[in-house]
């Protein structure tokens, strides 16, 4: 049997919201496999929702910007070890400079950005090494997305002082009214964290996985087989409402309208949402010791 560590219990607790003892039991019965433990907790109805992102840990900032004509936008995650360095003006200036490079040159991948010239003959990767040496803390360019509008426009939104950024690509013309509407939709993406744009983006495997979880929940509740299939239809509709951007209830709506309805005669074509540290493991803090004490106690 795999050793169930305090860190594993902590992660499972963060991702499911389940109690500490439930998390410990789930991990012990599934040899420390966190994904299987999540499914088990959901099947038992102990975990009502799962945060797919996992641990949120690394410090840094999200930089985003669009061209004046709103035909191209860039979003970049630039990480540091501490929040103190993320507030450093040299750190912020370097991030802004890199976004400008990606916006103004033919840069679409992080590898291309690292190879781009930033100061004379110096590459971005070399300039970053210099900055690390100067400030005395490790930093990294984690991810980059470049969105080019073919038949519509793009809009950006930054939240939490640069800790979260969003790009939305829309159909239509970048009129003042449409840009305002697009920014509101980007704010919705920041707040509601949709996993897909629409039902069409949900893969068959993802859908089947959700159905299986729901089916086992209903079986645990003792529902008869003929009723389960009917209930599953409603549960899948709810899944789309909660996870697909265009089907979500618009966060500022007063009349329960969906994002698609709010968008009206323009359509959401794609979106990018970056939050600092999504999925990066952080150093264990005192909470891990607390968990360990309860496991071993």
From Swiss-Prot:
Main location: cytoplasm
Compartments where found: Cytoplasm
InterPro entries assigned: EF-Ts_dimer_sf (IPR036402), Transl_elong_EFTs/EF1B (IPR001816), Transl_elong_EFTs/EF1B_dimer (IPR014039), Transl_elong_Ts_CS (IPR018101), UBA-like_sf (IPR009060)
Record carries keyword Secreted: no
GO molecular function per UniProt: translation elongation factor activity
A cellular-component GO term for this protein: cytoplasm
Region Involved in Mg(2+) ion dislocation from EF-Tu: start-end pairs: 82-85
GO biological process, one term: translational elongation
Protein keywords: Cytoplasm, Elongation factor, Protein biosynthesis
Stored SUPFAM superfamilies: Elongation factor Ts (EF-Ts), dimerisation domain, UBA-like
Protein biosynthesis keyword on record: yes
Gene3D superfamilies xref list: 1.10.286.20, DNA helicase RuvA subunit, C-terminal domain, Elongation factor Ts, dimerisation domain
Function: Associates with the EF-Tu.GDP complex and induces the exchange of GDP to GTP. It remains bound to the aminoacyl-tRNA.EF-Tu.GTP complex up to the GTP hydrolysis stage on the ribosome.
UniProt xrefs under NCBIfam families: tsf
Protein family according to the UniProt entry: Belongs to the EF-Ts family.
The protein's name: Elongation factor Ts
Annotated source species: Fusobacterium nucleatum subsp. nucleatum (strain ATCC 25586 / DSM 15643 / BCRC 10681 / CIP 101130 / JCM 8532 / KCTC 2640 / LMG 13131 / VPI 4355)
